[in-house]
UniProtKB/Swiss-Prot annotation:
Stated family: Belongs to the arginase family.
Classification of source organism: Bacteria, Pseudomonadati, Pseudomonadota, Gammaproteobacteria, Enterobacterales
Annotated organism of origin: Salmonella paratyphi B (strain ATCC BAA-1250 / SPB7)
Sample GO molecular function, one term: agmatinase activity
Cofactor(s) listed: Mn(2+)
One GO process term, biological-process aspect: L-histidine catabolic process to glutamate and formamide
UniProt binding sites for Mn(2+) 1: H130, D155, D159, D241
Note describing how the cofactor binds: Binds 2 manganese ions per subunit.
Record-listed E.C. numbers: 3.5.3.8
Domain of life of the organism encoding this protein: Bacteria
Function per UniProt: Catalyzes the conversion of N-formimidoyl-L-glutamate to L-glutamate and formamide.
Protein name, entry field: Formimidoylglutamase
HAMAP family: Formimidoylglutam
Catalytic activity: N-formimidoyl-L-glutamate + H2O = formamide + L-glutamate
Sorted UniProt keywords: Histidine metabolism, Hydrolase, Manganese, Metal-binding
Length: 313
């Protein structure tokens, strides 16, 4: 059974510069850490949650270790300077998934996300493998049942695989099937896709599903496509698979990208999403601390989370 645990206070440590000025603060000094999972107490805040699960990665024949991602990313975030927006972060702990009950863990995450959103929070989830996206996305769909929800994925992979059980490669097929079951439109855009890492069958599935696809080669000039997608939906769920980044920026994932989309381009793509007023949920997935020897990759991933919270409107 998936268990909830509060985040350890030892994760939120850093350099104390407060002697210099009242606003010389870092995230470890402004993040609120909750000892209970009680989103109803934190309206208008951002729920920072971990999904400590890599069962989907294992099922997808990937490199396990992403279950350690949430706490590694917290440690990297802790010492970053606190600016406007970061005071809204409330750490609502980790959902720790037992092996091999991925489906049960996804349902628990789905319910937790829906509860947060219905309480007036927004959700920033730290994975975990990309199996995180089905639980997170389903919770968003549940919370906004009467509105159109757009799913924006920055990823080298389409993750529309067809298998007999859930994996880290199936979340968007699962979300498409959920939309079908609910008789609602499936609005999905994937930026940073590597043609070399996706079979023709996956491209055919994306075309059949009317997915907006932007290849890694074209992300430098994709702001118009991003704006067009934002305009056509009411609410947005943003998910960033860190393997969208090039291997030299992000080696600490299950499947590092030989080409990838540089961090600066990823940031420019997500800025209008964060500032749109439509973003309700975001996550960072696939970070694997086992392959981050000096913590540099954690800082790259944390910068994305830092920027999302800062820009979020």
């Amino acid at each position: 059974m998936t268990q909830w645990y509060p985040a350890s206070p030892a994760l939120w440590q850093g350099r104390d510069d407060s002697i210099e000025a009242p606003d010389a603060r870092r995230l470890f000094q402004t993040v609120t850490r909750s000892e209970t999972f009680s989103p109803e107490n934190w309206q208008q805040k951002i729920a920072l949650m971990g999904f400590a699960c890599d069962e989907g990665v294992k099922r997808n024949a990937g490199r396990p270790g992403a279950a350690g991602g949430p706490d590694a990313l917290r440690k990297a975030l802790a010492n970053m300077a606190s600016h406007q927006g970061h005071e809204r972060l409330v750490d609502l702990g980790n959902w720790v998934a037992p092996t091999p009950d991925l489906e049960g863990a996804q349902q628990v995450l789905r319910d937790a996300v829906s509860r947060c959103l219905r309480a007036g929070m927004r959700t920033l989830v730290l994975g975990g493998g990309h199996e995180t996206a089905f639980g997170h996305g389903a919770g968003v769909l549940d919370a906004f049942a009467q509105e159109s929800v757009g799913i924006i994925n920055l990823d080298a992979h389409l993750d529309l695989r067809q298998t007999d059980r859930a994996t880290s490669g199936t979340p968007f097929r699962q979300l498409a099937q959920l939309c079908d079951a609910q008789s609602r439109a499936f609005h999905y855009a994937c930026f940073g896709v590597s043609r070399a890492a996706n079979t023709q069958a996956l491209w055919r599935e994306a075309q059949w599903r009317n997915v907006t696809v932007v290849e890694d080669l074209d992300c430098h000039d994709a702001l118009a496509q991003m704006a067009q997608f934002i305009d056509k939906v009411d609410k947005i769920y943003l998910t960033i698979d860190l393997d969208v980044l090039p291997v030299w920026e992000m080696p600490a994932v299950s499947a590092p990208a030989a080409l990838g989309v540089p961090l600066i381009q990823v940031l420019r793509l997500i800025e209008p999403v964060c500032r749109s007023g439509k973003l309700q949920a975001a996550d960072l997935v696939e970070f694997n601390p086992r392959f981050d020897e000096d913590g540099a990759a954690a800082r790259v991933a944390a910068r994305l989370g830092w920027q999302i919270a800062h820009w979020w409107r």
